[in-house]
Design a protein with these regions (language model features):
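ABC ATP-binding cassette signature C-motif
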Residues: 1-184
C-alpha cells in the first residue's frame, strides 16, 4: 500500500502553495493518473512520493508518506545528466538486481519491449537513445529492480506509437501499483 496523508507542498522561494491537504491511498493492483497543467507541481509531487529529499532544497513539505514494504520505482521526465553519459551496459550493470537475473529472465524482459537481451550489453550512450528507447530502458531497469510501485512522470512525452503501445501494455498488465502523471 502507498498512502499519502495531508500533504502540503509550498515553494520556499515565493511561498506559492503547490498542493494543500492532499490525500491518496493506492493498494496492490490500483492504477491512478494525476492530470494537470504544465508547471503546476506534478513532477514535484512525483519526486516527493519517490523520495522527499529530492525536493528538499526548494520545497517545504508537510505530511505523511507511508510506503510499507513497497519498492518504489521512478521514471522521470528526463534522463539525468549522469545517466546520459553512461553506456547502456553501465546503466543496467550498476543495478545489483541485474546480476541476480538469469539470461532467460533478461531475455523475457527485453522481449516485452520488442528487443533482444543484447541491448543490455550495448556500449551506446544512454543520452544518444531516442525518447522511446530511453523510456523502454528505464522501464526495463525498474522491472529488473522488482519494484512494486511504478511512478511514471509523463512517460508518454516524446515517444513513438510502438513505445506508447508497449507502455500501455506494461501498465495494464502490471499487478502492483501504478501512479501516472500527465499534462492537460
Amino acid at each position: 500500500m502507498l498512502q499519502i496523508k495531508n500533504l502540503n507542498l509550498t515553494h520556499k522561494k515565493d511561498l506559492r502553495v503547490i498542493l494543500s491537504e492532499f490525500n491518496l491511498v493506492l493498494n496492490k493492483g490500483d492504477k491512478a493518473v494525476i492530470i494537470g497543467e504544465e508547471g503546476n507541481g506534478k513532477s514535484t509531487l512525483m519526486k516527493w512520493i519517490y523520495n522527499p529529499l529530492l525536493i528538499d532544497n526548494y520545497i517545504e513539505a508537510e505530511g505523511e508518506r507511508l510506503v510499507g514494504k513497497e519498492i518504489l520505482g521512478y521514471l522521470p521526465q528526463e534522463i539525468s545528466e549522469e545517466d546520459k553519459e553512461k553506456t547502456i551496459y553501465e546503466f543496467f550493470s550498476a543495478e545489483e538486481m541485474f546480476w541476480n537475473r538469469t539470461p532467460k529472465e533478461l531475455s523475457e524482459i527485453t522481449g516485452k519491449f520488442g528487443m533482444t537481451s543484447e541491448f543490455f550489453y550495448s556500449d551506446q550512450k544512454m543520452g544518444s537513445l531516442s525518447g522511446g528507447e530511453k523510456v523502454k530502458a528505464h522501464l526495463m531497469r525498474l522491472i529488473i529492480q522488482d519494484v512494486t510501485v511504478l511512478l511514471l512522470d509523463e512517460p508518454s512525452n516524446d515517444i513513438d506509437i510502438n513505445t506508447l503501445e508497449i507502455l500501455e501494455k506494461i501498465i495494464n498488465d502490471w499487478e502492483h501499483i501504478v501512479l501516472f502523471m500527465m499534462k492537460l
